[in-house]
Amino acid sequence: MTKKFHTIIVGGGCLGTASAISIARKIKKNGGDPNSVCLIEKMVLGGGLTARHSGIVRAANADPTAAQIAKISSDMWLNVENIWDAELEPDRYGAIWIAKKDSNNGNKKWDQLEQQLKSSNIRFNSIEFEKARELLPSFINISDDETFYHEPDALQYDPADVRRALYEAVRRSQITLEEKTEVLSFRRNSSGNITEIVTSAGVMKC
C-alpha cells in the first residue's frame, strides 16, 4: 500500500530533522496536518552524531561569510528550545585556537583573522601563554613558540543529549518518523518532478 505525505525528508540528522520540524510547523500554522511530513532515516535518528561529531559549535572561520553563518547557527543552538520545542543545554567551555609563531614572534594571519571576526561581532581574542595554560586541561601540551586565541562563546553539546532532543522534537512536532528505512529509488512524473520514493518499507508518495 502506498503511503501519502505532503513532504518527505530523506536523512534524519540535525539538518533533516530541523527541515522536517520547520515544514511541519508551517503546515500546522496553515491548518494542515503536521503528521503529513515524513522523515526517513536508514538507521536511527541522529545516529551519525556519536560517530562523526564532537558536538562542538563554533563561529570562528577564515571565510567572513562562513563565520557569519556559523554565528547565526550558534545563536540558534542557544535558542533551540524555541525552535525545536525540546530542551538542550550546552557546556560553555569556549575554545582555544593554537597557531605557530612567525619570525616576528606573532602570527600576522591569525591577528588579521582576529580583527576580521571582531567586525562580525564574534569574540576571538589573542591571549598570553599563561592564560592559555590556565584555560586548557593539563594533559594538553603547549609551548612558547605557539600563539593562542580564545573563542569564549564556542559551545559543546553531548551527542547523546542532541539525539534525545531530536527525538523529543520529532514527537512534539507530530512528524511521521520512518527509521531503519532505506531509500531505493525515486519516481518522477511527466514533468520530471519527484512524486514517489521507493523504500525498503514500501512506496511513499508526496
Task: Say what each PLM segment does.
Residues 2-15, 38:
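Beta1/beta-strand and adjacent pyrophosphate-binding region of the FAD-binding site
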Residues 24-51:
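Glycine-rich FAD pyrophosphate-binding loop
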Residues 30-35, 87-91, 178:
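Short helix-terminating capping/connector loops at secondary-structure junctions
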Residues 41, 128-129, 179-181:
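Short loop/edge segments at beta-strand edges and connector loops
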Residues 43-45, 132, 166:
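Short beta-to-alpha linker loops that shape the active-site pocket of alpha/beta-hydrolase fold enzymes
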Residues 54-138, 145-146:
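Dinucleotide-binding Rossmann-like beta1-alpha1 core, especially the glycine-rich loop
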Residues 150-206:
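Helical element adjacent to the flavin cofactor pocket in flavoenzyme catalytic cores
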